[in-house]
């Protein structure tokens, strides 16, 4: 295996080496995630679970409608009007139990929505006796992801596993960069000509052309350079080539929805796989579930379901032979239901040009037996290598990876898996292999003064500003040191403290200043609540800021740095938290995290930080 002695290999001499390495890494990740959940449930008392926001107690539930045949249950707190602090977010897999999920069989559901006063959860099967008990809510672990990544690794290991670009992806060839640049072989057709959208700038157009002419293309998109815009135009160009159904994936549901929205706007026939609850509401009409509900064969399906339900209701009063025949008919009925469902899905997939889903979602069994010669992965630098391979093992002959290895890497829970290489994305390994990414070099988000520092320190001054200062005027409500340079540092003398749950950090003095700055900007009337974002490296500070905000500020987003990648706001308030004599800036020493934090703002960036930390010199650009 090739690569540095201290890090994971960049290339592999045998597919077996790759298989063994990554199979161990994903096993460690699953084991450590489940052990982490188990230890907290076993060892933490009720008070600590509540303070850490990972468990809610004393919930009462009631049915609250349906989402494409799945039951929605609304949970509220029996003892108080609001839900209190918690870390549950839309799309999270959760466990519902009466007392203890480790001592009973919990119900598994998915968070549909959260508010100050309630949490709505979607269940595949309607829970029984939901109104008769009080419930507790815990976060669950995602074993499906492990199973699908394991299957993908097995396919890569197997020469007949349906991965035409296997040797290139693993570096098992003499000259990977040259091989990556070769014309793809797409079903016997060596590259059909296509047209490109007129709204691409020069770097975007170069990337789009490469994506249709090369076997493997890496596209690096720094903040605000139009990664998703370019990805959508590539997918549109591919769809006009009419070579076969295209697979478009990303690591997160948010990024998949952005691709979906762009494709729908361009008139591309697209279907979105995945649970509708995880899809943006206005896009749910493009989900497989919604399309199945509107399919002409839906009536046949409902008729068969009604017949089965009638038999189920009557069977308890039957005896002997009659009962045996009824069971036989029910079994035949379910077989017919599955046949109709498969027929509907196949018809939808046969007529679609692009299938959109998450990397892990592309392992869904409804795609089994299908091949996708062209695969695009957005957010490729936030996906672990095994997650990316789930999509690439669907028969990819032409691949585009879009991302930015100067921003946040994949999220990995297991320290040992991270140390051995799981935190390195496939995109980054291919860069290390010598395949140079095409740079989208014009940024359209930030005021030039805001983009100056990240351009110098992360992108070697290779970025151009596509917006002028006069188009990003500093907002009122703050006495900017220089109105032509909307980057401000607010020095705070106040110490950091360990959060009440003992797992994070917070800084009360910074919290007070953040709230004051927030109110001052809003009172000026030029910026709305949804135009401001508050970023901090620590979950404890997120909680402290939220707890200090009045109800009228609910619409202001407060997130960790990790929760803000891919997002932008008119104004960003950045609370740094750390305050110590050792000049220890903690999470901020990770330059990729700092890059994300400093590149979310369009018109104004305000850093609130301890006076003597090194961060002020960084921000005074």
What is each residue range found by the language model?
Residues 272, 277-339, 461-478:
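Non-catalytic helical/coil scaffold and regulatory linker elements
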Residues 74, 87-89, 93-97, 110-112, ...:
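Beta-strand cores of modular interaction/reader domains in eukaryotic scaffold and signaling proteins
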Residues 82, 194, 343, 558-560:
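Short, solvent-exposed loop/turn positions at domain surfaces
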Residues 2-25, 31, 69, 80-206, ...:
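Pre-ATPase regulatory/linker segments immediately N-terminal to the P-loop/RecA-like helicase/translocase core
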Residues 23-52:
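Extended boundary segments
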């Amino acid at each position: 295996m090739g690569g540095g002695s201290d890090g994971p290999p960049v290339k592999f001499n045998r597919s077996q080496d790759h298989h063994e390495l990554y199979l161990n890494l994903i096993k460690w990740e699953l084991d450590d995630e489940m052990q982490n959940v188990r230890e907290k449930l076993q060892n933490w008392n009720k008070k600590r679970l509540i303070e850490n926001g990972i468990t809610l107690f004393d919930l009462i539930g009631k049915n609250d409608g349906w989402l494409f045949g799945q039951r929605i249950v609304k949970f509220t707190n029996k003892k108080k009007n609001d839900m209190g602090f918690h870390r549950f977010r839309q799309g999270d897999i959760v466990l519902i139990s009466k007392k203890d999920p480790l001592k009973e069989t919990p119900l598994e559901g998915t968070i549909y929505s959260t508010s100050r006063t309630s949490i709505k959860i979607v269940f595949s099967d309607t829970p029984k006796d939901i109104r008769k008990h009080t419930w507790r809510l815990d976060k669950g672990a995602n074993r499906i992801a492990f199973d699908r990544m394991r299957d993908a690794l097995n396919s890569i290991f197997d020469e007949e596993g349906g991965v035409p670009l296997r040797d290139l992806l693993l570096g098992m060839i003499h000259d990977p960069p040259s091989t990556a640049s070769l014309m793809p072989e797409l079903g016997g057709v060596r590259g059909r000509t296509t047209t490109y959208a007129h709204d691409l700038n020069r770097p975007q157009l170069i990337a789009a052309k490469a994506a249709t002419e090369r076997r493997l293309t890496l596209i690096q998109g720094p903040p605000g350079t139009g990664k998703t815009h370019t990805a959508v135009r590539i997918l549109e160009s591919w769809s006009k080539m009419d070579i076969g159904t295209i697979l478009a994936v990303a690591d997160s549901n948010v990024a998949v929805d952005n691709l979906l929205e762009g494709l729908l706007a361009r008139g591309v026939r697209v279907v979105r796989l995945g649970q509708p609850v995880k899809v943006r509401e206005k896009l749910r009409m493009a989900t497989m579930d919604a399309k199945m509900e509107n399919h002409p064969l839906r009536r046949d399906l409902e008729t068969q379901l009604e017949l089965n339900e009638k038999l189920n209701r009557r069977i308890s009063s039957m005896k002997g032979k009659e009962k045996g025949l009824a069971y036989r008919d029910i079994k035949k009925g379910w077989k017919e239901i599955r046949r109709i469902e498969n027929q509907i899905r196949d018809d939808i997939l046969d007529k679609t040009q692009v299938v959109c889903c998450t990397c892990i979602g592309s392992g869904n069994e409804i795609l089994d037996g299908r091949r996708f010669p062209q695969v695009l992965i957005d957010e490729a630098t936030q996906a672990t290598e095994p997650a990316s391979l789930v999509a690439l093992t669907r028969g990819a002959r032409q691949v585009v990876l879009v991302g930015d290895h100067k921003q946040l890497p994949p999220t990995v829970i297991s320290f040992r898996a991270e140390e051995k290489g799981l935190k390195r994305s496939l995109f980054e390994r291919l860069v290390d292999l010598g395949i140079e990414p095409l740079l989208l070099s014009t940024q359209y988000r930030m005021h030039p003064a805001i983009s100056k520092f990240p351009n110098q320190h992360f992108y070697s001054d290779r970025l151009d500003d596509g917006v002028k200062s006069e188009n990003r005027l500093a907002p009122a409500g703050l006495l900017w040191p220089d109105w032509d340079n909307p980057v401000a540092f607010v020095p705070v003398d106040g110490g950091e403290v360990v959060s009440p749950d003992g797992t994070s950090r917070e800084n009360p003095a910074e919290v007070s200043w953040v709230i004051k700055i927030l109110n001052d900007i809003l009172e000026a009337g030029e910026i709305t609540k949804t135009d401001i974002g508050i970023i901090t490296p620590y979950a404890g500070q997120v909680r402290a800021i939220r707890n200090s905000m009045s109800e009228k500020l609910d619409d202001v987003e407060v997130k960790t740095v990790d929760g803000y990648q891919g997002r932008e706001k008119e104004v960003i308030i950045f609370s740094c938290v750390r305050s110590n004599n050792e000049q220890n800036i903690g999470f901020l020493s990770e330059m990729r995290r700092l890059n994300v934090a400093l590149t979310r703002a369009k018109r104004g960036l305000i850093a609130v930080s301890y006076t003597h930390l090194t961060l002020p010199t960084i921000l005074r650009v």
